[in-house]
Amino acid sequence: MKIEQVKIENFRSIYDLTVEFGKVTVLIGKNSSGKTSILNVIRIIFENLDTNSTEKNLNITTITEQNLKDQIRRLWFYTYQNYPIKLAVWLNFDEGEGDKLREVCGLESNVKKAYIEVSIESNNNQIIWKLQNVIIFGYVSETSKIAKEALKKMKEIHSKVTGHNIESKTGDSLVPCVIVESGTIKNKDVFNIFIDLIKNKICYVNTFPEIYKMVNIPIKGLFAHPMVSSELINVIKNTIKDFARLRMLYDCLREIKGSVDTYEQPDRTEILTKSYEGMSLNYELFGSGDQIIDGILASIISKGKHHIFLIEEPEIHLHPAYIRRLARVLEDLANNLNVQLIIVTHSPDFIATLKDKRFVIGVRKDSIKINFEGYPTELLATRIFYPFRGSRLSESLARDLGVVPGYFLFSDVAILVEGNSDRIILQGYIDLLIEQLKNLPKFSYIIIPYAQRSLKEMIKVFKEDYGIKVFLIADNDEEGLKNVKIAKDMGLRENFEVFIIEKKDILGYIKPEDFILALDELLRECLKDKYEEVLQDEEIKSIIDEIKIFGACKNEEGKNEKDLLHKLSGKLFTVLKNVDEEFIITLGWDSGRSIERYLKCKIAEKIVSRLTEVPEDIKKIILNIDSELG
C-alpha cells in the first residue's frame, strides 16, 4: 500500500493543501512551517479507523490537562470552527494486496486504488471524528455485465464525492465500489475486509526520547538511560529474535557505520546488550545516534512490505556523514522491501544524498488571500513546493557555493550580487557592521553571485518558489544597470530591495596599497618562474603602476571609471600565450575574462581579513536592507 495524495482543509496552519507522495517523500522546511501537521493528518485518518463505527466522539469536558485544552480551538485554521476539518487520502495498492476485496466486489483484477475521506467537527462540547466516504477501485472489462452496471451506477457518485473522473486503462474501466457514503456503511462485509486490510499499515516511528525516571541517586548524571522510546526498544528486541531480520539490520548498519557492534543473546530480550571490543555493554551505554539508527531500521525491517512509515527527524544526534549514509540506506530499504517512507527532516545533508529527489517537498508559510468569516483578508498558511522538479538552478547554485542541495530551504534572505568577489567583500563589510545591525543577524541570509546565470530565473526561484526575501546589489556599470531593470521588472523596488553601488566594481573600494599587495602575492603564486618574464612587458608594467596609484578602478575627471583589473587581465592572457601557451592551459585560463574572474575572487579572499572600514554608500545599502527586514 502507498499513499498517492492527501488533501487537507482547515486544519491547524493549513487552509487548503494537496500533497503528492512518492515511495520516499521528504518534508523539509523551517520550524513551525506545517511539516508535522501533514504527518498528523495521515495518523488522524488511519489510526482512528476500526470496524465498529464510522464515528468517534471526544467530550472536551473530560480533558483535564490545560495544555490539551489550549490546543482544541487551534485544531482549526485560525480557530475557524464553523467549517469542518476535511481530510482525504488516495491510496494505491500493491499487486496481490487486495485479493479478498477483489473477490467480494466481483472485480476481474486486483483492487488498484482507494479513496478515504474524514471530517472533524466541533459541536458544543464534542469533537467528532467521522469517516465520511470510502471508495475502492478496480479494473474490469467494459464488455462485462459487472462493468456496465458498476459504471452506470457509480460514475455519478464517484465524481460527486471525489471530484475526479474515472480513469481508463487499455480499454478497461476503473470501476468504483462505494463502501461508505456520507458516513453510512453501504456494505458491512466489504467494509470490515477493507479496514482489516489497511489497519496497522501506518507506522509512526517516534525518534524522540522518553523521559525516564531514575531512582533517587545522590550523584547526578552518573548513570545512562536509553535515548529512544520504550516502543523502539521493544521493536529492536523483536527484530533481533529473527535471524533473517537480524542479518538485514547488520547489513544496513555496516553501510552506515562501516562496522557493527553485534547484539548478544538475541533470544534473551529482557536486557539489550551489545559486544564492544570484547566487553558486554548495555544498549543504553552506546551513543544516542547508534540507538536511534538501530530503532529506525528495526522498525522498518520488522514490519516489511505493504507498510507506510512516518519518521520525524531521523537525523537526530547523528554526525553529518551518518546522516548522508542513513538517507541512502533508507532509500534502498524502501525499494528493496517495497515500503513507503514519509520523512520530516531539518537536514540538507539528508536530502542531498537521495538519488530520487522528485518527492522532496519544501514546506513553508505564505500569505494567502481568502474570504474569512464574511470578509476578505490575508492570513499566513502552510504551502508546499517541489524544489527539485523543473529548474535545476538551486542545485547548481549549491554546488558553486559549496553547500548541499536543500540549503536554500532554510534561508530567509537572499542578497544577490554580481560575482564571488562581491560576495566575499560584502560579507566582510556586514561583519564590520554587525553591532549596528538589528535585524539581518537574526535571519538566515545568504549572499549569492548571479553572474553567468539568468537573473530573472534566480529572482523567480528564490522569491516565488522558496518564498525568500530577495535583495539585489548591482555594480555601477552598463551590465549592473541592465540587472537593476530586470529586478524592478520582477517586482523588486529600487532603494528598498534593489541598490547600486557608486563604483563599477566592489574591489574599487579597496585601498590601492592593499590591492596591489594582494595582486602581487597572487601573481607570484600563479606564475611562479614565469613571473619576472611576464611582468617585463611594458604595457603590463604601465597598468600595474596605475593600480599602485588608483587600485582596481581609476577615476578620471570627465570620463567613465576605468576598470584597471579588467584591462590587466586581458593583457596578461595575451602575454602568457606568447610566453608559454601550455602553461596557461595548466592554469585553466582560457581568456582574459576567466583570468579576471579568478583574480577578483582570490584577491577578495586575501583582502577580506584586512578590511577595517565600510564605504559610506555600501554602509547605507546594508543598513537599508537591515531596516527593510525590521
From Swiss-Prot:
Coiled coil: none annotated. The keyword Hydrolase does not apply. Residues 412-507 form the Toprim domain. Keywords: Plasmid. Gene3D superfamilies: P-loop containing nucleotide triphosphate hydrolases. The keyword Lipid biosynthesis does not apply. It comes from the Archaea. This is Uncharacterized protein MJECL35. It comes from Methanocaldococcus jannaschii (strain ATCC 43067 / DSM 2661 / JAL-1 / JCM 10045 / NBRC 100440) (Methanococcus jannaschii). The lineage of its organism: Archaea, Methanobacteriati, Methanobacteriota, Methanomada group, Methanococci.
